[in-house]
């Protein structure tokens, strides 16, 4: 029995396995989503590469790759009401706020932040970070990153970002722990 058939069997027999994993491995529907690096949309001011959005995965996930330079502000404290967020550090070091605790994740570490948990992130002091993010399940989010790009270039303002919190499931919060980390 091949490993894909075995995983399909596990998916069918264990309801705790996420639906989208089963869907991706369902050989009766061999559809898939492939994003070639050369074809991915790059947002140069923010360092974000858009990989795949919710409409391309039937809402299963959205993914992007972000490169953070030394001293980058990263993302302020926020939470996603309806999506877990996966972090996979490809290179460098990232400080991550998880509710009221800050942890550091480094190259090849994987972190999953559950829906509803306040979090923030930025490269660790003196470090860069290269990170793949996955949100699941997901609303369409690519326009959120395009809005951030416009903020970086001065073509949008903070008010626009605040007005999109429900649309993009990105809800900003305050954190004394994150503010004090300097």
PLM feature spans:
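A short glycine-rich, His/Asp/Glu-containing loop-to-beta-strand
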Residues: 40-77, 83-84
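Ligand-binding loop in jelly-roll beta-barrel domains
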Residues: 57, 115-142
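Tight coil/turn sites that cap or link beta-strands
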Residues: 71-72, 108, 116, 126
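Glycine- and acidic-residue-biased ligand/ion/polar-headgroup-sensing regions
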Residues: 82-84, 88-94, 99
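Short acidic-glycine-tyrosine-enriched beta hairpin
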Residues: 100-115
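Acidic/histidine-enriched, glycine/proline-rich intrinsically disordered or flexible terminal extensions
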Residues: 146-182
